A protein has these predicted regions:
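N-terminal active-site segment of His-dependent metallophosphoesterases
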Residues: 1-79, 85
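Active-site neighborhood of phospho(di)ester-bond hydrolases with catalytic His/Asp-centered motifs
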Residues: 6-8, 61-66, 93-99, 206, ...
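Active-site environment of divalent metal-dependent phosphoester hydrolases
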Residues: 11-15, 70-73, 99-107, 210-214, ...
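Extended active-site neighborhood of metal-dependent phosphoesterases/phosphodiesterases
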Residues: 79-127, 141, 178-227, 267-268, ...
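Intrinsic disorder/low-complexity segments
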Residues: 123-186
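Short acidic, glycine-rich surface-loop motifs adjacent to enzyme active sites
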Residues: 235-251
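Conserved beta-sheet core of the metallophosphoesterase superfamily
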Residues: 254-327
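A short C-terminal boundary segment appended to hydrolase-like catalytic domains
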Residues: 323-353
Length: 353
């Protein structure tokens, strides 16, 4: 049996105190939102509790589906790197970025420099990437380096997602310097990556692109979708797990938060097949299904890993996937664990997909 752990959207706290010059962009609205609301939701102590509980699962591998940071300050990427190292070495942790990890175009360089080993394909089966995987030692503990402010990052409402029709993207034009289409295409060209771990093929895709203020849409792009389809087709003998940040099956409460080319993603999976798609972004426990070439493919979301307990949103949690079987006869048991009102992490649900 192969055990895969999945957490997402840790929105690491505390948020470093930004310099004035760093707020001359979309970061300003994000920082105000943090001060107003999100710092009361995302808490470092909650995240530490979740990670300690996850360690007891003795997973073979850990998948993290994005949004490690909040407003993409340079210091946030340093903190996130240290948190990743505490979670596990690059060979044991697979990461895909989220929209907060691409909050502004200037974040690309820091994300690539500091997180690349966790987003790199196997050296023996390299995807179309320009980076090499490097090994790092895991520190004993993680303490965020904050230049100022303290508490937490954000979650959202607790209604399970359900499939809806995809619409067109309509939004304000980008401020100068906020979006560089060539740079976005170069970033997308580094994905997908492929990692083979036992019977499992982990395929990581990126939906992270800079967007205007008050937008949180994601985009894969046609070339990345085509490369993903090729990797899916080439790993049909494995249990194929696609890691993605934005849920590719719904419009999540707002058209300004969705994956704009979700339909193209679903078409690729319908043609090439996959055994499981896992995502974050909505901060919700969710399960939906899309068509595959031989039956339905489960798409499973998790809440923010740092969300404090509340009746207003899904509290922090993570999933365990227990994978067994062989091609044509795979089994996957899902175990959902989450934070309770008493601050303890317990099993919430168990089911097969």
């Amino acid at each position: 049996m192969f055990v895969l752990a999945h957490l997402s959207d840790p929105h690491l706290a505390p948020l470093p105190r930004p310099r004035i010059a760093e707020l001359a962009s979309k970061r300003l609205s994000g920082y105000l939102n943090w001060l107003r609301k999100r710092r009361a939701i995302h808490r470092s102590d909650v995240l530490a509790t979740i990670v300690r509980d996850l360690a007891q699962a003795r997973a073979n591998h850990i998948a993290v589906t994005g949004d490690l940071v909040n407003i993409a300050l340079p210091a946030e990427f340093e903190n996130a790197r240290r948190w990743l190292e505490a979670l596990g070495p690059p060979a044991d942790v697979s990461l895909v970025p989220g929209n907060h990890d691409a909050y502004v175009a200037a974040a690309d360089a820091a994300r690539e420099r500091l997180w690349a080993p966790y987003m790199a394909g196997d050296a023996t089966s390299p995807p179309p990437r320009l980076r090499e995987e490097r090994a790092f030692q895991q520190p004993e503990d993680f303490e965020p380096q904050a230049r100022g402010q303290g508490p937490s990052p954000g979650a959202q409402e607790s209604t399970p997602t359900s499939p809806r029709k995809r619409g067109e993207v309509l939004g304000p034009s980008m401020a100068k310097g906020e979006f560089d289409s060539q740079r976005a295409e170069e970033e997308a060209a580094a994905f997908p990556y492929l990692r083979i771990r036992g019977p499992v093929a982990l395929i990581g895709v990126s939906t992270a692109v800079p967007t205007p203020p008050f937008m949180a849409t994601g985009r894969l792009g046609g070339p990345q979708i085509a490369r993903m389809a090729a990797l899916l087709a080439g790993t049909a003998a494995q249990f194929r797990v696609v890691l993605i940040h934005h849920p590719p099956h719904v419009v999540p409460r707002s058209r300004l938060e969705r994956l704009v080319d979700a339909a193209a993603f679903r078409e690729a999976v319908a043609a090439a097949g996959a055994e499981l798609v896992i995502h974050g972004h909505d901060h919700l426990r969710s399960l939906a299904w899309i068509d595959g070439p031989r039956g339905h493919v489960p798409m499973i979301g998790v809440p923010s890993a740092s969300a404090a307990f509340s009746t207003d949103h899904d509290a922090a949690g993570y999933n365990i996937y227990r994978i067994a079987g062989h091609p044509g006869n795979w089994t996957c048991e899902v175990v959902r664990r989450g934070l309770g009102a008493d601050g303890a992490v317990t099993e919430c649900e168990r089911f097969a997909v």
